[in-house]
Every structure is written in C-alpha cells, then in structure tokens.
Amino acid sequence: MRNSSSSTPPSIKAQHRAAKRRAIRRRRIDLNCGCSIYIHIDCRNNGFTHRGTYHCASSREWRLYLGDNKSPLFQDNQRRGSPLHQHQDIPLTNQVQPQPEESIGSPQGISQLPSMDDIDDSFWENLFK
C-alpha cells in the first residue's frame, strides 16, 4: 500500500537501475605469459603479483580500443622524466618472494589424525553419556 503523504522521499529504484547498467571502468593489461588482467580504473599505479612476477599497473602501458568491435591498438608511452632509480651503479635485487610449493600431505601444524574407525565403541559411549 502506497503512502499518500507528500513528505515521503522519492524512490531510488531508478537510480539503482541506472547504476547497475553503468559499465565498470577498468583497464585491460596483457601480460607476457598470455594472461589478461583487468584493473579497476581507481587502482591505477598499484602493482600486483601474477605467477611469481611483480607487475606495475602504471599508466606507461595501456590499451586503446577503437570502434564498436574494440580492436586493440597497443601504446607504450615513453617516460620523459628522470629515471625511476637515481643510483644506476647500485645493483637492484629482485623483490619478488617465491611462493612455496603446495604439498599433497597433511599441513605442518596438524599431525596425522587416527581414523575414526580405529576408535573403539566404549570411547563413544562414555563421550555421549
């Protein structure tokens, strides 16, 4: 039942519908491994790690889409400022920390638990009394 009072605020359903239809602004980055990453436009100049390699999502590399079929035209804007690292004579080490390989066995913190079938019935009877 609708409220006939003039003090009720207008419905925001129309605004919600428009917000749902609005496209998410994101940028596509094609990596050397063949993967494509989509980064939200507000997350520019942030980095990310993919398959053990750190990538910087700066505005140096960007993709421009043309027309309705979105054909890619790759651009690489060359930086015209000072170099990123001022001291070129100091060797820079790789800051990427390798990820440990996953093991098939049980985790280190949990020892192997006995099978529930190996526990005798008297234990369960005493437990639930």
Swiss-Prot record:
GO cellular component: host cell cytoplasm; host cell nucleus; viral capsid
Start-end of Polar residues biased regions: 91-114
Keywords of this entry: Activator, DNA-binding, Host cytoplasm, Host nucleus, Host-virus interaction, Inhibition of host innate immune response by virus, Metal-binding, Phosphoprotein, Suppressor of RNA silencing, Viral immunoevasion, Zinc, Zinc-finger
InterPro entries given in the database record: Gemini_AL2
Region spans: Transactivation: 115-129
UniProt GO BP: symbiont-mediated suppression of host innate immune response
Domain of life: Viruses
Residue span of motif Nuclear localization signal: 13-28
Effect of residue 35 to A: 95% loss of transactivation
Keyword Phosphoprotein: yes
PTM: Phosphorylated.
Location (main, coarse): host cell
Single GO term (MF): zinc ion binding
Zinc finger (unnamed): 33-50
Its biological purpose: Strong activator of the late viral genes promoters. Enhances the expression of the capsid protein and nuclear shuttle protein. Acts as a suppressor of RNA-mediated gene silencing, also known as post-transcriptional gene silencing (PTGS), a mechanism of plant viral defense that limits the accumulation of viral RNAs. Suppresses the host RNA silencing by inhibiting adenosine kinase (ADK), a kinase involved in a general methylation pathway.
Free-text note on domains in this protein's UniProt record: The zinc finger and the transactivation region are involved in PTGS suppression.
Record family assignment: Belongs to the geminiviridae transcriptional activator protein family.
UniProt protein name: Transcriptional activator protein
Species, as recorded: Tomato golden mosaic virus (strain Yellow vein) (TGMV)
